[in-house]
Structure formats: structure tokens, C-alpha cells
Design a protein with these regions (language model features):
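Structured, beta-strand-rich domain cores
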Residues: 90-96
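Long, compositionally biased stretches
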Residues: 2-80, 98-152
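Short beta-strand-centered segments at strand-helix junctions
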Residues: 81-90
Length: 152
């Protein structure tokens, strides 16, 4: 969904102003230095949450071509979910063992309306550094298409 400038009411003594919503979002941007596979041109995203769709969240590009993903914390999609990050992934995220990371499994709707989450290649975000990365653990323990309850 494209962001547009919005008029801001100004005091009577000042001329009308406008603000760029994207500029405001950019202050909270998560940088993906390598992009997301298939969307490498998109490097900055915002994570949007709303009670209306909780526990789902939306990861939306604020640069590059339009791109947005709906996802869920994989630990909510599958009880006992654990994913071990490689040293390379930890370094790319600027994280260590004490860093609290955010996890995001992309959800897709299949032709019959079944919702599936990609638990094999989650997006991991370091909120302290505002850096994200889609990871692909070597163990391959989890499916790319984990069926969620409900339909689109």
C-alpha cells in the first residue's frame, strides 16, 4: 500500500505544511543489507503490528519496488520451535548470545485458501541495531509450508 504525504493542521499564523509518512517510517526502518531473497532491491523495511490482525504482523518495504509480507513469530505457529543461527548470521545481525532477536515467518495463502508459514527460512531482526536477515539454517528441521489453522 503506497504511503502518501498527509496534510498537517497548522496554527493560523503559519502556512500549511505536509509531512512525508515514509520519512517518519524511515526513522524506524530495519535495514536488510542483502535484501530478502527475491526482493534484493528492497533494503529498508518497517514492521507494522495491529491488534486487528494480531498475532500477525506486516513487514513492508519503504524503498525499492513495492513489497510487503505478512508473518508471525514462528514460536506461535509451532510450539517448541527452535532455530539455531550460524556464526555468519549472528555476525551479520550484529548479535551475540545475549541479544534478544525478533523472529518472523512469512505466511502465504495457497490456492485453496490454506495459510502456510515458512518455518525453514525465517526472517530474524536485531531490534537493537535495526538489522534484519532471512536465514536458512543448515539443519532443515522445519518445513517451508507449515499449515496454520484457519483460511484466508
Amino acid at each position: 500500500m503506497p504511503m502518501r504525504s498527509a496534510a498537517v493542521p497548522a496554527p493560523a499564523s503559519q502556512a500549511p505544511q505536509s509531512i512525508d509518512v515514509r520519512e517518519g517510517l524511515a526513522r524506524n526502518a530495519i535495514t536488510f543489507p542483502d535484501g530478502i531473497p527475491g526482493f534484493e532491491a528492497c533494503r529498508r523495511f518497517v514492521l507494522l503490528a495491529s491488534e486487528a490482525i494480531a498475532p500477525l504482523q506486516r513487514l513492508e518495504a519503504i524503498d525499492g519496488p513495492p513489497a510487503a509480507f505478512v508473518g508471525i513469530d514462528p514460536r506461535l505457529a509451532l510450539s517448541g520451535y527452535r532455530c539455531r543461527l550460524s556464526a555468519t548470521d549472528m555476525h551479520a545481525l550484529g548479535a551475540d548470545a545475549s541479544t534478544t532477536l525478533l523472529w518472523f515467518a512469512i505466511i502465504a495463502s495457497e490456492a485453496d485458501g490454506t495459510l502456510v508459514a515458512n518455518l525453514r527460512a525465517p526472517i530474524v531482526i536485531n531490534p537493537e541495531r535495526m538489522v534484519g536477515r532471512q536465514v536458512l539454517p543448515d539443519d532443515g528441521l522445519y518445513p517451508i509450508r507449515h499449515v496454520l489453522q484457519g483460511r484466508a
